[in-house]
Amino acid sequence: MKNKSRIYLIASAFLILSVSSYSMHIMEGYLPVKWAVFWFILCAPFWIYGLVKLQKEAKGNVEEKLTLALAGAFIFVLSALKIPSVTGSSSHPTGVGLSAILFGPFITSILGTIALIFQAVLLAHGGLTTLGANAFSMAVAGPLVSYGIYRLLKKKNKSLAVFLAASLGNLSTYVITSFQLALANPSADGGITASFVKFAMIFAVTQIPLAVIEGLLTNVVMNLLEKYNIKQGVKA
């Protein structure tokens, strides 16, 4: 019962913090139709398999369900934070590393997409037409990187594995976002490559420090969960 209360309090705190948060995603109507559809198609297999795995996970005990809620709240709040950059753009954490470590990339693709839908509908962050692109970068690519890094390094140094999984999962999201923006807006001089470099450099100024912070914060949350034996291991 104490463990359940702790999870509930942590999740509630994250949700309360989200009230005054803001975010940066690819905005509504920004992508040409062909690219908007393309990213939806790429996300579809992850969503389908993710729903199957989420249904199985939801049949677990109350503690498992509360941990799912915590992972979802962590994604929603961190991805809703807005940090202005020196270039006039903005960056934010993603929060997907924690869920990828606890539940694997497929369930995380669902949790991340749900967070993006709520942000688009309730907070006017991102958009529904660009949901596929935003979901692929934050809810698919990021979790895959986080999951792979954690699985690769967890037996050598678990704390380092968590840190790198969350940090590099964050950075990979912005590498993909830069690529998505470059595909939709190739530079007149240099094409997609030049455009990608431009967007990546804009994001890097604030995103690298944010990735480090997210890695540290994810480690703190993981240590709390493991301290109370709330959830162990990773589920693919």
Swiss-Prot record:
InterPro entries: CbiM, CbiM/NikMN. Pathway: Cofactor biosynthesis; adenosylcobalamin biosynthesis. Disulfide bonds: none annotated. It is a multi-pass membrane protein. One of its GO terms (biological process) is cobalamin biosynthetic process. It is found in: Cell inner membrane. The chain crosses the membrane at residues 32-52, 66-86, 98-118, 120-140, 159-179, 196-216. It holds the Pfam family CbiM. Belongs to the CbiM family. Part of the energy-coupling factor (ECF) transporter complex CbiMNOQ involved in cobalt import. This is Cobalt transport protein CbiM. The lineage of its organism: Bacteria, Fusobacteriati, Fusobacteriota, Fusobacteriia, Fusobacteriales. The gene is cbiM.
